[in-house]
Amino acid sequence: EPLHYVIIKAPEDRDVMAAADVIRDAAVQLREAGIETPEHDAKLLLAEAAGVELRDVDKALLMGEELGTAEQLARFQSMLARRAKREPLQYITGHAPFRYLDLKVGPGVFIPRPETETVVQAGLDWLTRNGMIHPRVVDLCAGSGAIGLSVVSEVPGSQVWAVELSPNTAEWTRRNLSETAKKYPSIASNYHLEIADATSFATLAQLDGTVDIVITNPPYVPQTDIPEQPEVRDWDPELALYGGSMDGTLIPERIIERACRLLKPGGALVMEHDVTQGDRLVAFARATGFAAASTGQDWTGRDRYLFAVS
């Protein structure tokens, strides 16, 4: 009897590929667009589009499995196209991790950076060393709320006042406050947001001389130092980036002056700055009236923040 060959054909509507193929093709596209971490970004976007964790994507890659419905893969492709145009990953996914928080971000709000976690840690370490029970903390230039929300959620009994200049950005701060309060209900009454100019002596004037610590990440990028990365240059709000002068120290210096009045004697200022600004800002802090000032490094060993005690 003649042999019958049965050709098994996949159904026409079957446009789901193995996760490994999806990631491989996506990584090629992102690499060609100049993305430094193409595989990582592709995996994160696929996880986001499919509504799963990064480890689920890794498992699918390892096991040769498929991942995501046709609809989810279509969403992935549109996210991929945005990333290939160098839109920041966090704006596409709509959130950014920071310490123990997952913060909502989007166009108009500065994306919190890992190095700022070091700045927060330096402030928390100081509070711990000094046995502060119910510290009064100020976060100037709040942005997404990363610094102040980390403090209020990690330090029981802390009172945080946050100042943000842009009403548009403050919407993101508020959103992150309500999201964080779902996880840490006690913080709602301990976090106070003010839409105001952080460099003005009128802002939070009622707190002058009573604050334990100011932790801040002000705009500090030198005007001469336009960021090379399109993600930063073309997407981060300029208001949150540039320090207002050629060397970028104008706004940081005004923040030092403001912090000096806010702090009680022996209070501390921890302020992020550019790698080039350490010596100048230490000298400025001392000239402004701080008793001690030094430069702290981030986890890469780069000069990253001013630490000053009033």
Predicted regions: what they are:
Residues E1-L3, P135:
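Short, low-complexity intrinsically disordered segments enriched in A/P/G/S/L with frequent Arg
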Residues H4-L62:
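Non-catalytic accessory regions of SAM-dependent methyltransferases
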Residues L30, L127, L177, A181, ...:
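Conserved hydrophobic residues forming the short capping helix/wall of the S-adenosyl-L-methionine
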Residues E39, A47-D125:
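Conserved AdoMet
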Residues L45, V214-N217, R233:
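Hydrophobic beta-strand segment of the Class I
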Residues E115-P227, R254:
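Conserved SAM/SAH cofactor-binding pocket of Class I
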Residues P219-I251:
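Mobile active-site "lid"/loop adjacent to the S-adenosyl-L-methionine
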Residues S245-A308:
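Conserved Class I SAM-dependent methyltransferase catalytic core
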